[in-house]
Amino acid sequence: MGERKGVNKYYPPDFNPEKHGSLNRYHNSHPLRERARKLSQGILIIRFEMPYNIWCDGCKNHIGMGVRYNAEKKKVGNYYTTPIYRFRMKCHLCVNYIEMQTDPANCDYVIVSGAQRKEERWDMEDNEQVLTTEHEKKQKLEMDAMFRLEHGEADRSTLKKALPTLSHIQEAQSAWKDDFALNSMLRKRFREKKKAMQEEEERDQALQAKASLAIPLVPETEDDRRLAALLKFHTLDSYEDKQKLKRTEIISRSWFPSTPGASASSSSSSKTNSVLKKLAQNRRATPTSSPVTMGHLGIVRRRSREVPESPQHVAETFKSGEPQLPEGTNQNRPVSPQDCSLETAETPKNSSALGQEESCQDRPQPPPDTSPEAPNPQDTPQPCSLGSSLVADYSGSESE
């Protein structure tokens, strides 16, 4: 750097070559500039490249081979006439300093402190590499004929052992001799494989679009093909096919039943069962504790007369509570709800209106011939269950 800057540069007027000699001495500087700042201590700063992989002892990080550092170089000794240099550098990942020095005896570098070597060395003999002949052995081969003959026999036996391996290597090299043909064959195989992959992708896309699938399909295997060959699928009938099948069944069906008697008996039995069910429901609905009488329903019978009665006589009759009944009429006989409904239907409108106005307490009294000590429980007046009394008019009947 100093020479480059000093050559063809400015020379001051007071520069004397005999006195100063060079521009560096004139400027009182070193040609290496900052690299020679510790030159008085015998230390020169150089650019050092890591010879192998190591681990830093300070940060425990890996430092690869080929990483460069600004290292302080100094001489620490000699191996015979070969100087031994030591290099001190700072780790770029921490504040730890690493020291290494040369090993001329083994043509290697040795770590002094600050790091640990990643062991990747091997024995050349174990690795079947060519070993260098030592100087003493080389001189002995040149001077001693018997030693040279023995050494030759050992070399020939080693060659016989390595011959199969060497022949295999030669065959492999000859197979790759024509690189153009190999490249053409490789590209052709690649095109065929690419075309097959494109066809398979198109089939997968068509299947996904047909089945509305959004999942990726895995490649088909031989087991899948064998399993698919064993399966059998039945197609579902459409609506039109089902309708045709129904029409065919209806057309092929017989118009007449196979056993008319059996069908008639089955229909009659079903009707009988329905009637029995209705009767059972009616029995559950009607009370069966005591018979219903005329007194329970509040119906009063009047004897029919040829001459219509006056309204005053009718009112007196209702007030006295002793209606005149025709002979042979039993007032206290039980009356069914069906009889009541028929009698009410035959009653004229005027009689029904009068009966509705009558209260439930104006019930008929028992006949005089009956003793009051033992009244009939059916003739005793009971509360009206229909809410209003009914008066039956038998004016058009045939009773005397």
UniProtKB/Swiss-Prot annotation:
GO terms for cellular component: post-mRNA release spliceosomal complex; U2-type spliceosomal complex. GO terms for biological process: mRNA splicing, via spliceosome; response to virus; RNA splicing. Residues 1-26, 255-400 are annotated as: Disordered. The modification Phosphoserine is found at S40, S310. Residues 364-380 have a biased composition (Pro residues). InterPro entries: Saf4/Yju2. Residues 283-292, 327-341 have a biased composition (Polar residues). Pfam families: Saf4_Yju2 (PF04502). May be involved in mRNA splicing. PANTHER family: SPLICING FACTOR YJU2 (PTHR12111), SPLICING FACTOR YJU2B-RELATED (PTHR12111:SF2). This is Probable splicing factor YJU2B. It comes from Bos taurus.
